[in-house]
Amino acid sequence: MLIKSQRLTLFSPLLSKTRRIPVNSHQTLVAESVITRRTLGAITATPSFHKNPVVIRRRIKLERVTRNCVRIDREIDEEEEEEEKERGDLVKQSIWEQMKEIVKFTGPAMGMWICGPLMSLIDTVVIGQGSSIELAALGPGTVLCDHMSYVFMFLSVATSNMVATSLAKQDKKEAQHQISVLLFIGLVCGLMMLLLTRLFGPWAVTAFTRGKNIEIVPAANKYIQIRGLAWPFILVGLVAQSASLGMKNSWGPLKALAAATIINGLGDTILCLFLGQGIAGAAWATTASQIVSAYMMMDSLNKEGYNAYSFAIPSPQELWKISALAAPVFISIFSKIAFYSFIIYCATSMGTHVLAAHQVMAQTYRMCNVWGEPLSQTAQSFMPEMLYGANRNLPKARTLLKSLMIIGATLGLVLGVIGTAVPGLFPGVYTHDKVIISEMHRLLIPFFMALSALPMTVSLEGTLLAGRDLKFVSSVMSSSFIIGCLTLMFVTRSGYGLLGCWFVLVGFQWGRFGLYLRRLLSPGGILNSDGPSPYTVEKIKSI
């Protein structure tokens, strides 16, 4: 068998002559080069091939490998592009699914929030058809009745959280005990408010008018004395409603409030328009509707398998637990209600017609305001499981906030347009007094600016409450209240009138929006903290 051989030419600057080394075609070139280097020491071997079949085959293999690598790389790029596109589609789909879930959840809740202001708005519309003095008297009347009831929303927060926690532990007995304790607290608070209204109602109305517009004091006092009879029913019904929400039952409370709204509307129509009872008739209609609503709330709770007529005295430890959860929320709500009330307080010194115009715009604003509150409730219901615990998912929480902000911005614009159009284009719905209508039209611009920010602001606030950033929320609200009240005093004394007061309200809303947004977008915010959550199950038992 013949073995073909070739000669390998070696060049070296250390050798004057060229040396040829035979190389068999079936031998490995690399090994031969290693042997040559070992033999010649520092001599470098540089092979020179001329149409070597082995080299040609290796080049062909190299080209094939290169082509395969290029093809595989191209396929990988295409797959990455497809995956990125799919991720984008999933993000869009996730946002869309979340938005649909939000709308489905907030539907019944929105109806519940609307019923209360709707009853006050019905009173405003009906009374406005008769007397301008009684319409102005509704200003301090609604503050001492409706606005004060919102101060007790801390009972609602405590009830829904504590009941939801007990049900999560599948401890129905504990849930029943907590409902009984909170029903007792609601009853005691209601009786105290009834007593305070009876004893200090006339003094409160007189102090609210600051010795001016004395003509509205008798009508306003009559209104709050009648409405005050419903205080125990209002707060007991509030606890029953919140317990149902903690059980994720929103239809029962919605039916109760819808029935109350219908009763209030029929009562106002019969007592005020047909029987001429005026503001007293409106107060009796609202009181009756609230009593019926409380009974239906408790009946709905009984249908869930709980005893809504069981009351239990809380222990000191239970009172401390409730106060620790509810105190920051109480400060926040109290600051907000106090600021709105202070605007009415400033308006009482500007004349009866100005106060009546503010009453109309304030009731319309409050009616539109509650449309955004379910977004806050949604954040408090869906965010906790994403922010801490075993199912912590910060990207999903950020996506949920994005969905809430999209809905909030859209809702704010819609509410701003509709809320401005009704008093602007159809003021006769509220009153036929030309002076009052003129004052209403002056407030349309700040009315739109303040209303458009509300849904987004409450979405951010609800997210912070879900993340248990309670100290920050309460500090923002309390500081905003102080700064806002000082600004209102300056504006009133400087002669800017009711228009200046409403622009202070614009600053109050947009200032809170900016502070909340900055807090959530900060690197150490609850939506951007990649470290372990500081809120463990042991520390937070009311989630």
UniProtKB/Swiss-Prot annotation:
Organelle targeting peptide span: 1-30
Keywords: Chloroplast, Coiled coil, Immunity, Innate immunity, Membrane, Plant defense, Plastid, Transit peptide, Transmembrane, Transmembrane helix, Transport
Domain of life: Eukaryota
Deletion phenotype: Enhanced susceptibility to several bacterial pathogens and alterations in PR-1 gene expression. No salicylic acid (SA) accumulation after pathogen inoculation and more susceptibility to both virulent and avirulent forms of Pseudomonas syringae and Peronospora parasitica. Age-related resistance (ARR)-defective. Defect in stomatal response during bacterial infection.
One cellular component (GO) term of this entry: plastid
Keyword Coiled coil set for record: yes
GO biological process: defense response; defense response to bacterium; innate immune response; negative regulation of defense response; response to nematode; response to salicylic acid; salicylic acid biosynthetic process
A Pfam family recorded for this sequence: MatE
Name of this protein: Protein DETOXIFICATION 47, chloroplastic
Lineage of the species this protein comes from: Eukaryota, Viridiplantae, Streptophyta, Embryophyta, Tracheophyta
Gene name in the database record: DTX47
